[in-house]
Curated annotation (Swiss-Prot):
Alphabetically ordered keywords of this record: Cytoplasm, Lipid A biosynthesis, Lipid biosynthesis, Lipid metabolism, Lyase
Originating gene: fabZ
A Gene Ontology term for the protein's cellular component: membrane
Entry's EC annotation: 4.2.1.59
Matching PANTHER family: 3-HYDROXYACYL-[ACYL-CARRIER-PROTEIN] DEHYDRATASE
GO molecular function: (3R)-hydroxyacyl-[acyl-carrier-protein] dehydratase activity
Catalysis: reaction(s): a (3R)-hydroxyacyl-[ACP] = a (2E)-enoyl-[ACP] + H2O
Protein name: 3-hydroxyacyl-[acyl-carrier-protein] dehydratase FabZ
Positions of disulphide bridges: none
Length: 158
């Protein structure tokens, strides 16, 4: 794999599983298609009718919950922060965890439904040490469905 000096720019699910601690049903990133360390990430999740959440949200009109869109954005931001510091390093990932600190300027614009490819477009707004602030949009077919600014910290995993 790549080093932190020359990080890879794409991650498939087998790579994501080695960096993020999330698992089904809370892993909300299927693939990273673009990653520029300390700058930006583009990732996505394919939304299918088989998502457990559609059993109750809503049975006759399935809509992917906005809070899960924001969580997917946060997971993408966590990947960006971690790989900006350590590149693709599964051993280091076992010792670190990214915690949400704040969520600001959230807007939901268009419902996300089964069959949509939900893209997360995030950029680093600022970071100092282990504190990272990212902002951006979630998009479907090039249309903004949500936007937010997120702050997180990278901590030691106990």
């Amino acid at each position: 794999m790549e080093t932190s000096q020359n990080p890879q720019s794409q991650f498939f699910i087998e790579h994501i599983l080695q960096i993020l601690p999330h698992r089904y049903p809370m892993l909300l990133v299927d693939r990273v298609v673009e990653l520029e360390a300390n700058k930006k990430i583009v990732a996505y999740k394919n939304i299918t009718f088989n998502e457990d959440v559609f059993n109750g949200h809503f049975p006759n009109k399935p809509i992917f919950p906005g809070v899960l869109i924001v969580e997917g954005m946060a997971q993408s931001g966590g990947l960006l922060a971690f790989t900006s510091l350590w590149g693709f390093d599964p051993e280091m990932a076992k010792t670190k965890i990214v915690y949400f600190m704040t969520i600001d300027k959230v807007k939901f614009r268009i419902p996300v439904t089964p069959g949509d490819k939900l893209e997360y477009h995030l950029e680093v707004l600022k970071h100092k040490g282990m504190i990272w602030q990212v902002g951006g949009t979630a998009q479907v077919d090039g249309k903004v469905v949500a936007e937010a600014e997120l702050k997180a910290m990278i901590a030691e995993r106990d």
